[in-house]
Structure formats: C-alpha cells, structure tokens
Amino acid sequence: MGLVKMTRWRTLVLATAAFNLSFLIWFSFAPFTGQIAAEFGLSLTDLGILASAAIWSAPPGRILTGWLSDRFGASTVFGIVLAYVGIFSMASAFATSYEVFFVERVVVASAGITFVVGIQHVSQWFPEEELGTAEGIYAGIGNAGAAGGALILPRAFGNWSGPLFSTGWRAAFFYTGVVAILMAIVYVVFGQDAATKARAAATSESATLSTWVHTATRYGVVALALGYVMSFGLEISMNGWLPTYFREGFGSNLVIASTFAATFSLAAGLLRPIGGYVSDRLVRDQRDILPFFAGRYREQWTVLCMTFIVVSMTGLTFAGQTGNVLLTVAAGFLVGMSCAFTEGAIFAQVPAMFPNRSGAAAGIVGGIGTFGGIGFPLVYSFAAAEGMIHTGYVIVAALMIPILALNAFISRPHIASRAHVDGFFDGSRFESSQSDD
C-alpha cells in the first residue's frame, strides 16, 4: 500500500515518469557512439550490432514481466527492474574492456521491458473507453525519453571533465544509473497496483500458464504483435541508429547528429497519444474510415497507420539520396509520426481485448514487437557497409508489406469479431471466461 492515496491520474504520472527515465537509459549509449567506437576501436558494423544488442533482452523480458505484473503487481516489478538497471548502468561506467561493457549494456537495455509493466499498471486504473488515450499518453511521453537523452546527454556530458570520470559517456551512464535507483524507491513506496483490491486480485488469479498460452495464440494478438514489430520495433531501431546515420551520412558532429535524431524520437513519442485518442474517438462516434472493414473502428485506424509507415520509410530513402539533410530530417519526422500513430492504435486495442490479462497481452505484443529493433539495425549497418547508407530504409519497408497484409486480413469484420477468441488451437474452453473479461 502506498503512502498517499493514488488516483488514476497520479498513477499515470508515476508510470509515465518512470518509463520516460527507462527509455532515456535504454538508449543512453546512442549519443555517444562516436566516443565509444573511438575508445574500443569499433567499426560501423560493430555499432550496428551494439544498437541491435540493446534490444536482445526485450522480447523475453517483456513477455515475462507482463505476466509477472499481472501476478505480483506492477509496483513491485517496476521497482525491481529499475533498481538492477541502475546498478548495471553505474557498473558499465567503469568498464575497461569492450566485452565487459557489452554484457553490462545488454543488461542495462532491459530497461525497455518496463513498457509492459506500465501498460499493465495504467490499464488497472482506467476504464475501457479511456484506455487508448491513457495508454497513448503513458507510452508517448515515456518514449520521448529517447529524445530527451539525445538532446540532454551530449550537452550535459559531451565535454565532461568533472569528478570521477574524464569521459562523458562514462559520467552519463553512472549518473543516470543513480537516478534509476532513486526512481525505483519512489515507485515501490508510492505505487498501488490497481484501482481496487478486487481488481488486483482478479488480475492476479487469472495469471496462469494456460491463460497465457491462450492469449498468446489468438489471431488478434499475433497480428498486432507483428504490427508492433513494424512500428515500435522500427522506432527503437531508429533511436539507436539515427545518430550514427546523420554523422556518417551527412558528416554531422555529435551534438548536431543527436539533435537531428531527436526530431524522430520526439515525433515517435509525443504524437503517440494521438494514435490512441483517434482510436477511442472512432469507437465512440462509430465512424468508418475504411468501409471495407465496416464496424471494426479500431482495426481500420491501425491498418491505415501501418500503411503510413511503409510509405514514409520509402520516402526516407529517397530524401536521404538527395543529400539534403533538412529534407531527410523532415522525412524522419514523418516516419516517427507514423510509428507513433500505429503504436497508439495498437495499444488502444490490446488492453481492450483482455482487460483481466492486460499484462500478459501487452507483454506478448510488446515483446515480439521489439524483434524489429534487433533485426532492422543490422539491415541499416550492412547496407551502410556496402556504401548504401540510405537504402536500408526502403529494404525494411519492403519487409513490412506481408505484416501489413496479415493485419488487413485479420481486420475483416467476420474475422476481427472473434480475433480475441479464435487462434492457433481450440480456444472454446476459454471463451466463457473471456466473455467475462
């Protein structure tokens, strides 16, 4: 029990602040890739692997912590993750070999798994008709932590010569770790798991292996998880790669490259609430924007947003090939906007599908979605190594087309109406309990 009486808005503020910090720490290495590469003798391919490695713990970690949040409560889980992330971030500041540094940063990167913990926490406090907007605010402002890191860290630590460290990136990792530990204490002390004890108990009791398997294998969850690969997976891949892209592709220095990259992160983060709000609004107004999917209001918006991603990624390649950096920054902003809208749309659907299993569902979708953050940086770095640094984006866009087609197929009204029940094995024995949700 927290020290003060929590409301849904106080819970939203607490979760959002903690996730914003988590996201900042997750990608705190990105502004310092040049310094890190120089100190450890890394190539562009090595940097691509480092950016990819930042995502390795996210898929299994999100899947596990989503279920743990249902079972044991978000306050406890969020506090534990922030505490060990802070410890390893501080430890990475003292690394003298790249092998030790690499392992420590993989552990620090598990800060990204807190996303599903906060999604579960917020869903336990807000009514269904406000879920899209509330989750969009949480994730949008939280995701903007990457932009905050890109803007603040190189300015605060770029020329660091203060106590303990003579290298900026080491100071940045140490002091952000300290802040993470302090936030862990705040979350455990003030957080409350649900609006009522009854709701927290119902969620905990539903967190079983059988219900998790059922949730993970429904058609709707599988389609949205892959949709999250092409939206959030894309976002985190770009957060890790864009500072390197602007530095190598346009000859920008550390601060300027990070600032250009931050425009993408700001769009991908701060515009996400719009995606959730539009989804909520279409449901309230019962408005069809894609008549082919008549009556499936959230699904229509999600498919439209996914299409926007494919188009904008193609545009980013063409913008980069012009050599005009401002045009490329603008194109990157549009990619960030498309990611934001799609992510907001997807997580307006997920908690509504499984209100008493929101942690498990969010963990599955959020966990699978991060695979894009592992694979896409490899495409970017290998294309760059072949002298085609701008071409990686259109290659990724082409890889997304089958995912878009699958989501359009699942969104057809007669399939979408049962996408939370029908799946890859017989779900009939769960159907009655799902109706109760």
UniProtKB/Swiss-Prot annotation:
<dbReference type="InterPro" id="IPR044772">
    <property type="entry name" value="NO3_transporter"/>
</dbReference>
<dbReference type="GO" id="GO:0005886">
    <property type="term" value="C:plasma membrane"/>
</dbReference>
<dbReference type="Pfam" id="PF07690">
    <property type="entry name" value="MFS_1"/>
</dbReference>
<comment type="similarity">
    <text>Belongs to the major facilitator superfamily. Nitrate/nitrite porter (TC 2.A.1.8) family.</text>
</comment>
<keyword id="KW-0472">Membrane</keyword>
<feature type="transmembrane region" description="Helical">
    <location>
        <begin position="134"/>
        <end position="154"/>
    </location>
</feature>
<feature type="transmembrane region" description="Helical">
    <location>
        <begin position="36"/>
        <end position="56"/>
    </location>
</feature>
<keyword id="KW-1133">Transmembrane helix</keyword>
<feature type="transmembrane region" description="Helical">
    <location>
        <begin position="76"/>
        <end position="96"/>
    </location>
</feature>
<keyword id="KW-0534">Nitrate assimilation</keyword>
<dbReference type="GO" id="GO:0015112">
    <property type="term" value="F:nitrate transmembrane transporter activity"/>
</dbReference>
<feature type="transmembrane region" description="Helical">
    <location>
        <begin position="250"/>
        <end position="270"/>
    </location>
</feature>
<feature type="transmembrane region" description="Helical">
    <location>
        <begin position="359"/>
        <end position="379"/>
    </location>
</feature>
<feature type="transmembrane region" description="Helical">
    <location>
        <begin position="391"/>
        <end position="411"/>
    </location>
</feature>
<keyword id="KW-0813">Transport</keyword>
<feature type="transmembrane region" description="Helical">
    <location>
        <begin position="221"/>
        <end position="241"/>
    </location>
</feature>
<keyword id="KW-0812">Transmembrane</keyword>
<feature type="transmembrane region" description="Helical">
    <location>
        <begin position="171"/>
        <end position="191"/>
    </location>
</feature>
<feature type="transmembrane region" description="Helical">
    <location>
        <begin position="12"/>
        <end position="32"/>
    </location>
</feature>
<dbReference type="GO" id="GO:0042128">
    <property type="term" value="P:nitrate assimilation"/>
</dbReference>
<feature type="transmembrane region" description="Helical">
    <location>
        <begin position="106"/>
        <end position="126"/>
    </location>
</feature>
<protein>
    <recommendedName>
        <fullName>Probable nitrate transporter</fullName>
    </recommendedName>
</protein>
<keyword id="KW-1003">Cell membrane</keyword>
<dbReference type="InterPro" id="IPR036259">
    <property type="entry name" value="MFS_trans_sf"/>
</dbReference>
<comment type="function">
    <text>Is likely responsible for nitrate uptake in the nitrate assimilation pathway.</text>
</comment>
<dbReference type="InterPro" id="IPR020846">
    <property type="entry name" value="MFS_dom"/>
</dbReference>
<feature type="transmembrane region" description="Helical">
    <location>
        <begin position="327"/>
        <end position="347"/>
    </location>
</feature>
<feature type="transmembrane region" description="Helical">
    <location>
        <begin position="300"/>
        <end position="320"/>
    </location>
</feature>
<dbReference type="InterPro" id="IPR011701">
    <property type="entry name" value="MFS"/>
</dbReference>
